[in-house]
Amino acid sequence: MAKGKSKNKFNQSWLHDHINDPYVKMAQREGYRARAAYKLKEIDEQDKLIQPGQVIVDLGAAPGSWSQYARNKLAASPRATGGKPDGAVVAIDILPMEPVADVTFIQGDFREEDVFRQLEEVVMAASGGAKIDLVLSDMAPNLSGVASADSARIEYLCDLALDFAQTHLKPDGALLVKCFHGSGYSQIVEKFKRQFKVVAPRKPKASRDKSSETFILGRYLKVVN
């Protein structure tokens, strides 16, 4: 009984925080599907990630707020015409996602060969045969509460993003991934350092203080022998 009361109290507390969250209110007002858009916005404003003419891939895109922000930023370019983005955003997720204007969405698991091939074809068409400028990954596993298992799952998703970036990024491209502070965090950072010349942690204000969520940014691929 006490456990049920505790869980109900937690749910009520979360709901209260969510309703009164300024980023939730801002997302509703500005038409973003999730408050996560402001995490990317803050990092982008700090690091100037999204530039006119870029090809951007959003891994684990659903519900779509990162794709929305990237698309809007490209559409705000002085070179953009008719409200269309100057560049391209390609989003992929295992989960379904409501369409985002001017964003190409692929539903599927990019670890599967046919889905990966489809993603490559879409990217090649968008980039004119060139490589990608920016890879975004807000992917997160279903957490079990078992620290060792959760760390392994988080590291695995980061590895997937790193492998994808290594193959498809331009030499001066960038990769931004979500991860969590925990037992595997330092290993993820080391993997980034082996692959990128510049590596930086980011904890935007829109990321809740209570959360161990953080982001790692890698820029400028190292030459892999």
UniProtKB/Swiss-Prot annotation:
**Signal sequence extent:** none
- Keyword S-adenosyl-L-methionine appears in the UniProt entry: yes
The GO terms describing molecular function are: rRNA (uridine-2'-O-)-methyltransferase activity
Residues at the active site: 178
Which residues bind S-adenosyl-L-methionine per the record? Answer: 64, 66, 93, 109, 138
- Subcellular localization, as worded in the UniProt entry: Cytoplasm
Q: Which InterPro entries match?
A: RNA_methyltr_RlmE, RNA_MeTrfase_FtsJ_dom, rRNA-MeTfrase_E, SAM-dependent_MTases_sf
Broad EC category: transferase
Reaction it catalyzes: uridine(2552) in 23S rRNA + S-adenosyl-L-methionine = 2'-O-methyluridine(2552) in 23S rRNA + S-adenosyl-L-homocysteine + H(+)
- Name the EC number(s): 2.1.1.166
Q: Which UniProt keywords apply?
A: Cytoplasm, Methyltransferase, rRNA processing, S-adenosyl-L-methionine, Transferase
Q: Which domain of life is it from?
A: Bacteria
Q: Does the keyword Repressor apply?
A: no
GO cellular component terms listed in the entry, alphabetical order:
cytoplasm
Which family would the database say this protein is a member of? Belongs to the class I-like SAM-binding methyltransferase superfamily. RNA methyltransferase RlmE family.
- What the protein does? Specifically methylates the uridine in position 2552 of 23S rRNA at the 2'-O position of the ribose in the fully assembled 50S ribosomal subunit.
- What name goes with this protein? Ribosomal RNA large subunit methyltransferase E
Q: Which organism is it from?
A: Cupriavidus pinatubonensis (strain JMP 134 / LMG 1197)
For this protein's source organism, the top of the classification is: Bacteria, Pseudomonadati, Pseudomonadota, Betaproteobacteria, Burkholderiales
Gene that encodes the chain: rlmE
